[in-house]
A protein has these predicted regions:
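Hydrophobic protein-protein interaction segments
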Residues: 1-86, 90
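Signature of lipid phosphatidyltransferase scaffolds
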Residues: 82-111
Length: 111
């Protein structure tokens, strides 16, 4: 299960060949995800996605994804960069941020 938030839809834009491979792999492995998105019409590579939208516009080139003990921070710019951190404590810390965002966005959407 992957969780994340930020500048979604950029993988297809900056790495279109890898995007096709990634999308196919996720479908074959039945990988699910909970993403907090900036735009409702962004292309998401995963098939089984639960998505909520931030209630305000956030201008960012950064995307954070967490999977198992891995945290990947993408910097989507002319030459994309990423930092991969393989550490369970770091992944759990980012997971806690995601839980807080997700809970508060659920509360906003119920009003």
């Amino acid at each position: 299960h992957v969780i994340g938030w930020g500048a979604e839809g950029q993988l297809q834009r900056y790495m279109p060949h890898y995007y096709k491979f990634f999308k196919k792999t996720c479908k074959q492995r039945n990988i699910t995800a909970d993403f907090i998105v900036l735009k409702t019409n962004s292309p998401l590579a995963l098939v089984n996605v639960n998505a909520l939208q931030f209630p305000v516009h956030i201008d960012t080139c950064v995307e954070v994804n967490i999977y198992k003990e891995k945290t990947i921070i993408f910097f989507w710019k002319e030459v994309p960069e990423a930092i991969e951190i393989i550490d369970q404590n770091v992944a759990d810390s980012f997971r806690n941020y995601h839980k807080m965002f997700w809970k508060n966005l659920h509360q906003v959407s119920k009003q």
